Structures are given as structure tokens and as C-alpha cells.
Amino acid sequence: MNANPKFLSADARVDAAAVAPLPNSRKVYVTGSQPDIRVPMREITQADTPTSFGGEKNPPIYVYDTSGPYTDPDAKIDIRAGLPALRQRWIDARGDTETLSGLTSDYGRERAADPATAELRFPGLHRHPRRAKAGKNVTQMHYARQGIITPEMEYIAIRENQRRAEYLESLKASGPNGAKLAAMMGRQHAGQAFGAAAFGANAPAEITPEFVRDEVARGRAIIPANINHPETEPMIIGRNFLVKINANIGNSAVTSSIGEEVDKMTWAIRWGGDTVMDLSTGKHIHETREWIIRNSPVPIGTVPIYQALEKVNGKAEDLTWEIFRDTLIEQAEQGVDYFTIHAGVRLQYVPLTANRMTGIVSRGGSIMAKWCLAHHKESFLYEHFEEICEIMKAYDVSFSLGDGLRPGSIYDANDEAQLGELKTLGELTQIAWKHDVQVMIEGPGHVPMQLIKENMDLQLDWCKEAPFYTLGPLTTDIAPGYDHITSGIGAAMIGWFGTAMLCYVTPKEHLGLPNKDDVKEGIITYKLAAHAADLAKGHPGAQVRDNALSKARFEFRWQDQFNLGLDPDKAREFHDETLPKDSAKVAHFCSMCGPHFCSMKITQDVREFAAQQGVSENDALKKGMEVKAVEFVKSGSEIYHRQ
């Protein structure tokens, strides 16, 4: 795809690379209590254990799948029509929304009537936007606080469990050693939670719809699901659930197009992006967002102040509450699931950034700081926060309360400006919760490792356990081009301490707009960080995939090693650089150690020797050492021998 209007309107096609199933994988669905609750997962087929290792059956592994219908061969993908409205029946059945006659935002109507944008517009939307009926609240938090378990909550419970119980049962039924195998493959190290992060961290062995409801009701988790984005597959963000990751996409004034951004979205979700933020600041922001939302099975977030700034030609001092309010309604009617709103950037905090090394690095934060200084007034976002809540609950848009004063260098970490804003975000959370509006809190930024836990502990305390959503944090500032790694270190740590969602950083951070390859690199890095955090927390079932891959590695099932990994393509590519032949896929060594120094091959030889001698492995090792000792003495007890 590209930015050519005729091409977009007439010939837009999905990226072929995003629709092919991953190797040895297929889409499966688990049905809930009603037929239209069909929860997708990715089933990874495994080969049987070779007879030389015992000849066991290895049943499929089920993993969390964010790719939506794109990797389902039975689905018809037409990005000009968009995805099926998965949640529409559930929304209709609640009877608390009304269909509007058309768009109600001034800007939305203006764009719809502009002939210059006609060929750019998404052509497949034939339904009108919805809004809560007068006096109604349509948020998932409101339903949860009424004791209601919505279809979205049941869907999430099934999704979070990843068919773990069925997998262990299939192991038990795999043969005479099934029970032992199930115990081995289900084994998991105990996690560790400590300090403030331990408070309220209590994921049960099995996630139930009731548990989902209770966590949402308490504000400890959110379900971002705008009623105008029925295409989204329900997911949850909370520290008692799997750690999630977000991928940022979006055009700029100098690069990218609508088509490239849609491709980035489908690419990001293929590799595991749980949500996507459209941070477009260039041309056609409204149209770009429509294409993305209509084709996205994951929640979409935005920073509305970016588009509001475009409406006043980039002059922050010309922004008004009325322009911003119209932008919120415009985006809510399109279906944006969560808004980053920098309402914590208050006039009193701006001078606190004067002595920083890197000042204010948040785009949204700098916009609001400039407005506050230009007018010497309190931020209109802060002053009108109650009115913003009224808009949010009419569409079920979640808050992502922005950290506009986050540190942009480790020099500035945990300073007075950052922590002052965090306290304000805690106060705003309480206001939003009075309206039953869902909230998560955005966090830094650049923070050295020894200061990361303080961020988490203060957030849990001041923000009353609302989910934390952090950008990294980056743990050092010396590696431009490698900031996916500097931040991945901090992301794994803060995820362990209790952060619910990690915002990815790509290798292009601080350097340029990421392309598709950068998006994938960032996603894989952050999937790794999130998974490491799940393991450290002892999240139920987190170790199942590790155990399966380790078993495949020990049994030299190379294809299973590749396919069980986060990036099968790269694993296979690296292996084949030195051992490309098919015969190498069954070899009992790789190019790292070769056939004579493979530690796993040596272990297998010990086991075979023990079986032949009818002794234990320890006895076999002892006996082998005794034989070698005799040989050493007979050879003259010389450590080194001349050849």
C-alpha cells in the first residue's frame, strides 16, 4: 500500500506477509458459554520424541494469539471492508447504547464532507457511531461494579488460561509415563513479589470470569473496548494477568503513509502486539486512524492532543478546550479504545524541569507546558477533567493518564517534576473512578536499574493499584541504535515489580520513524521482557512454553525448537547459515560446538551408558571417571602428551 488516493480507495490489499500462519501453527478457537464467544489461540504442533530418547508423544502447545483473523486461513481478509464486528451483538444486547444519525464532532463532519479526502477514506464502514443512552454508563468497569460478568470478561478468562489444563491432561494421556511427563512439563519455579508490589498480587491458578470482573471493579485491571470498535478481540491489562505489550506506529510530517501504517499494525499484531497506539502527526490523521481501527483486532490508543495541535497549525498557545473536546468526540466515535491525556502536567510543575539535563521530552507534555506558560493558567485538561470523564464513559474509552514530565535521561530520573506529576495522576484516577471510567497510568522513561522499583512502589501507593504502563524504562543513555535493548532490561524488571503493560521501544528510538523491520524487532524484544516478568512473578503456566522448548532442545528436535520460539524465522535463519541441509535438522549437534563437544549429546551418551550398565546416571559418571583414572595412570600420569 502507499499514499496514492486512487490506490487506497480502489486497490488496497493486506500485506501478504502478515496473513500466512506461523510455521507448524494453526488458529484454533475455544468456545465459551455461548456460541459467539470464540476465543482464538495459536496451536503449535510438535514432533514425537525420537525413539532413542524414549519415543514419547509431544502434544501441541497453545499460546496467546494477537493476530486476529489475519492468520486464519478460513478467514476472508479484505482491508477495504474491515474486520467482522465481533462484539456487536454483545453491545446491542445490553440495550444501553443508541445509534447516532451521523458523526457529531465538527471536525468529523467536515472531513466526511471534504471532496479532497473522498478517495482516501475507508470505504467499508456502513454503520453509524454509537453512544451511551442518556443517563447510562457503558464502561466495563461500571458493569463489573454492578456485579455483571460481560461476554468480554468471559472471553478474557478463557484467553488468559491458554488451554493450560487441557495441555497437561493431554500429556497425562500420552502414554504409560504420561503422569510423570505432565508433572515435569507443568513444573514451574515459584515467583517472587516483594514490598509494595506484593500487595494485591494474587493471580489464581486458573483465571475465572469472576476474577476478571473483580479486578476490573477494583480498578486493578482495565478492558479497553470502545463500543465503536466492535472488531476488537477483548483483552485485559492488569498486573494479575499476563504482562502485555504495546506497539507504537504512526506517520510524521516527513515520512510514511496510510498504507504503510496499516501494514505496520498488521505486522505488529502478527508478532505479539497486544495493543497498538497510532501516534500520527503528519497528513490525514483522521483517515489513517479510520483505516487502522477498522482493520485492528487489538485495542487502539491515541494521543488526542497531537491531532488537536494540527488543527491549530502547530501553535500550542492557540489550543482551546473546545477544540480538544471536539477531538475527543471525533476519535471516540471512530472507536479509539484508550486516550493518552496529559492532565497531570500542571502549571506549578513546569518550573521544576528547568534544571533537568533533558527538560520535557514528552511531546504531549511539552505542548501542555507551552500552553500553560503562554497563558499563565492551569492546564485546560486538568480544569476540565470531569467533563472529559463524561465523554469517556459515554463510549467506554479508557484513560491512559500520560506522564508528560517523564525523565528523558537517567540524570533526570525520579526527580521532583516526575513524582509531582505522578501524585496528580493518582488524584485524577480517583476522580475517573467516581465515574466508573477505566484508568491506567503511564510511566517513564529513562531510569537506572536501582531506581526502577521506587517508581513501581510509588505508583501502586499513589495511584491505588491502577495498572502501570511504562515506556521501558531505558536503563542507560549510551546506546543509540540499541535502545530496544537498554529499555528491554528495564521493561523486564518493572514488569516483574508489577507493571501491567510495556510500551515497546524499537532500535530507531531517538533516531527516526521505525519501519516494519524495526517494529518486529521491538515487538520480539518486548515479548521477551514481558515473558521474563511473567516467569519472575510466578504467573500460573508461564513456564510451560519454556519447558516445551527446553525438552525439544535436549531431544534435538530442531524444527520444534524453531517453532516454539518467539521468532521461528530468525531461529531457522541463524541455524541454516552454517548448517543449511535438511540432514542438519535431525543432527545431534549444531555449529556452536560441533559433534564432539555438544554438552547435550554428552549427557545423552551418559544416559545410554547407564542404561547399558544397568546403573543410575550418577553411578555411570562415577564408573566412567574410574575408568578414565586408570587410563591416566597407565599412560604415565602426564597431563600433556606430545603428538
Curated annotation (Swiss-Prot):
Binding site for [4Fe-4S] cluster: C590, C593, C598
Gene Ontology molecular function, alphabetical: 4 iron, 4 sulfur cluster binding; carbon-carbon lyase activity; zinc ion binding
GO BP annotation list: thiamine biosynthetic process; thiamine diphosphate biosynthetic process
Keyword tags: 4Fe-4S, Iron, Iron-sulfur, Lyase, Metal-binding, S-adenosyl-L-methionine, Thiamine biosynthesis, Zinc
EC number of the protein: 4.1.99.17
Highest taxon, organism lineage: Bacteria
Cofactors required: [4Fe-4S] cluster
UniProt keyword Zinc present: yes
Catalysis performed (reactions): 5-amino-1-(5-phospho-beta-D-ribosyl)imidazole + S-adenosyl-L-methionine = 4-amino-2-methyl-5-(phosphooxymethyl)pyrimidine + CO + 5'-deoxyadenosine + formate + L-methionine + 3 H(+)
Keyword Membrane among UniProt keywords: no
InterPro entries in alphabetical order: ThiC (IPR037509), ThiC-associated_dom (IPR025747), ThiC/Bza_core_dom (IPR038521), ThiC/BzaA/B (IPR002817)
Enzyme class: lyase
Residues that, per the record, bind Zn(2+): H446, H510
Known pathway: Cofactor biosynthesis; thiamine diphosphate biosynthesis
GO cellular component, one term: cytosol
Comment on bound cofactor: Binds 1 [4Fe-4S] cluster per subunit. The cluster is coordinated with 3 cysteines and an exchangeable S-adenosyl-L-methionine.
Transmembrane segments: none
Residues binding substrate, per UniProt: N248, M277, Y306, H342, S362, R363, G364, D403, G404, L405, R406, E442, Y469
SUBUNIT field: Homodimer.
PANTHER family in UniProt: PHOSPHOMETHYLPYRIMIDINE SYNTHASE, CHLOROPLASTIC, THIAMINE BIOSYNTHESIS PROTEIN THIC
Listed HAMAP family: ThiC (MF_00089)
Functional description taken from the UniProt entry: Catalyzes the synthesis of the hydroxymethylpyrimidine phosphate (HMP-P) moiety of thiamine from aminoimidazole ribotide (AIR) in a radical S-adenosyl-L-methionine (SAM)-dependent reaction.
Family: Belongs to the ThiC family.
Protein name as annotated: Phosphomethylpyrimidine synthase
